[in-house]
Amino acid sequence: MEILDLENEELLGVFFEEAQNLVDILEENIMSLEDDPNNSDTIDEIFRAAHTLKGSSASLDMMELSDFTHIVEDVFDAIRDGKVNINNDLVDLLLSSLDVIKEMLALRIDGKVYLNDISDLKSKLKQFLVIDDQTFIKRFDGNSIKNNFCLSESDLEEIREGLGIGQKVLRISVVFNSNSNSEVENSGLKIFNILKNLGSVLHTIPKYEQIIEDKFLKRVDYYLIYSDIEGVKKSLDSLNLIESYLVDEFNVKEELKKLADEEIKDVDLDSNFVLNDNFDFTEDEISDLLLEVENQKLFKVRLDFVKDNPMATISGLQMLQALKSLGKIFKSIPDSSELLADKFFDFVIYYLISNTSEESIAKKINLPDVVSHFEIKNVNLESLKSVRLKEDDEAPFKENKNIKKNSPISVNLIRIDSKKIDYILNLVSEAVISKSSYNQINSEMITLFYNFNYFYDYQESFQRNFLIDLKIVFKDAGLTLEDEIESHINSLMSFKMEKALKDISELRNSFFRLLQNFKMTSGRLSRIITDLHESVLKTRMLPISNIFSRFTRVVRDLSKKLNKIVNLKMEGEETELDKSVIDDLVDPLMHCVRNSMDHGLETVEERVKRGKSKAGTIILRAKNEGNVISIEIEDDGIGIDPKVIRRKLIEKGTIKEDAIYSDFELINLIFAPGFSTAVQVTDLSGRGVGLDVVKKSIEKLNGTILVESEIGLGTIFKIKLPLTLVIIQGLLVKSGSETYVIPLNNVLETHRITEHDIKLLENYHEVYNLRDEVISVLRLDKLFNITRDDSLIEKFLIVVNTSNMKIAIVVDSILGEEDFVVKPIKDKFSSSAGIVGATTLGNGKVVLIIDVFKLFDLQKDTKE
């Protein structure tokens, strides 16, 4: 029985999602330390996030990420212990370190490894970890190796967290020879590596980072998970680099009690959990197991998991992957498919087939931030032959509802509010009930059908045998058919037909009631399905705070770079957008914010001269407007001068000198390709790329972007986006023999027209006069090469908005307004101009959805 291969995608996907969440926590809290450097809660939260990221990445063999995060963690440990003070320079250094962590994660997501040299950055971080050597040596003076180093509470906690059930900690205090032999230079690291091969080194004094710095240390204390004191002594006795050493058992609980005034709750060391000898196998599994084990050993490994670990929902998968490196996982409880679910399990039992030792397994699973307790049992294979599965031994694996699930921004995973899931499940339950109603109705309709068949057969038989029956009746009565035939026939037919009409009436009434019930049930099921569909779509919705929160760091860094003081305000962060829109909105908003920082806001000196406050303000604002989301990026800067825009456009040849444009139209020409008013090129602006890309990106999302500005007061970028790209409201239109959908959020108005209402200019360009406004006319039959229906006297004109202008689309008829589920077009049709996707109608017909922003491009191509 082979357990599912869970390597890679499922586990890594959840890890990257959680890792991104941890990075966001780190970034947000590190920046908050600038304003409140002594906030212990913030420092603790940063330390926990770094500690978790370090441990989780190590368990997945991402050592470049784990090792570097370990250094960052140690810096915060020093901050937490009051050994390091926070200032702006340290915050800058920590944020730079966080950028490296982000790069490491990004490369791992792409299947690559970070290889850049960051030794300078590591050295800067380690400057905060160095302990003065003289102080260190004086602490040892006294000629007695029993004069132990003082352990802080955080040191003891680190040791305590690393322990499993029944494990011992040995303290190995080593004094090194102080000769000048180069072999001794890194003697502390040599001993560390020797001890690491024996067990798990939980802690060292001084810390590991100082040990590896290639400087001579007189003494180092190592805290090792290992039970064989004599084995340790044997490994150290023959080493010339050691002057003396002492190995003794270290009682963590007693040391903690010395530091605390109250009794320490002994949750880790005195658990009442013990592995029993009952096995969780069926008879068939035992047979398979005995065949697979052969000359190997079977270990039963139980792991209890840390509940407050942000990555608690993948702990079971993490440990499964770790144990697989030692052998074959025959079975896990819960099984691998359950471990893939995004939920927390208090504990998991693994059955490992391997030739390894219990010590090796302990080293592999000893991750304090993941595992709170563990026990390893070497199973007696002979006992398996008589074991049967016992129902009372099955442990309840329940999801821990106290685990907090934060919304991530990263790989293609979505966290869903449990209330939304509960609502969906209720709707599904209603759908199941309605399905039962349908089954009942179906059964009744079948019965009714058989009744009709019986009635039909009866009437047919009656008509066929009527005369025969009549002759028999007459013969029995001693009558001749000719004498009384008319009266008897009338009497008999009257009786039969009266009964038949009564039966038909009852059947008709039954069928009518059935149809009424069917109609009511159909309506109820339709409502449930609609609600279910909408609820599923809501699970894709994420708050826009997922994007807005990123700009705190952006504004901070750019403020320093541009020597400006900027306050960032956010409004409507709870506004929700479809995840697919969220993912593609980051870059456009980034361009707009950078533009406001670089071009919009003045320097401190310029603002003071204009009578403004020294600090400029940027507001990120989001709000719902029906089926559309409105996003605004507002600044209180210098504003945009339409005269400057006009002059630049004339210089570039984009517009003619005699061209007439309103101020609003001129300002919105900043989205023209290659447009820039920057005097010099910098790494932020001046290259003429950016805002045209922003416009294209927004239009790709089926949205619009406009700019409003007033000289001296500021500028507002206004973006309108559909709530979701999955479902849209649209007009179903017909042109020739083809049917299309035009997104309703682009439609301004519709008109019924004749061909005489459309005018032709000298350049063969068709236009329509809409309340004294001349707008361009596009015909779908021309654009998509459809045979035109010239028999129609009247047609329809649909006026649509394309960001900064209106166009009119001519169609033969408007079939109606509906909601449409958008399906992407793949392969050779994916780049079709003028088409944004496809949808399926209720009758099964597939129709294309028009991309109104690309229709002009399609018309140019058609003319050429």
Curated annotation (Swiss-Prot):
Catalytic activity: ATP + protein L-histidine = ADP + protein N-phospho-L-histidine
Protein name per the record: Chemotaxis protein CheA
Protein function: Involved in the transmission of sensory signals from the chemoreceptors to the flagellar motors. CheA is autophosphorylated; it can transfer its phosphate group to either CheB or CheY.
Lineage of the species this protein comes from: Bacteria, Pseudomonadati, Spirochaetota, Spirochaetia, Spirochaetales
GO biological process: chemotaxis
Organism field: Borreliella burgdorferi (strain ATCC 35210 / DSM 4680 / CIP 102532 / B31)
Positions of the Histidine kinase domain: 480-725
Enzyme Commission identifier(s): 2.7.13.3
UniProt keyword annotations, A-Z: ATP-binding, Chemotaxis, Cytoplasm, Kinase, Nucleotide-binding, Phosphoprotein, Transferase, Two-component regulatory system
Location, primary (coarse class): cytoplasm
Taxonomy, superkingdom: Bacteria
SUPFAM superfamilies: ATPase domain of HSP90 chaperone/DNA topoisomerase II/histidine kinase, CheW-like, CheY-binding domain of CheA, Histidine-containing phosphotransfer domain, HPT domain
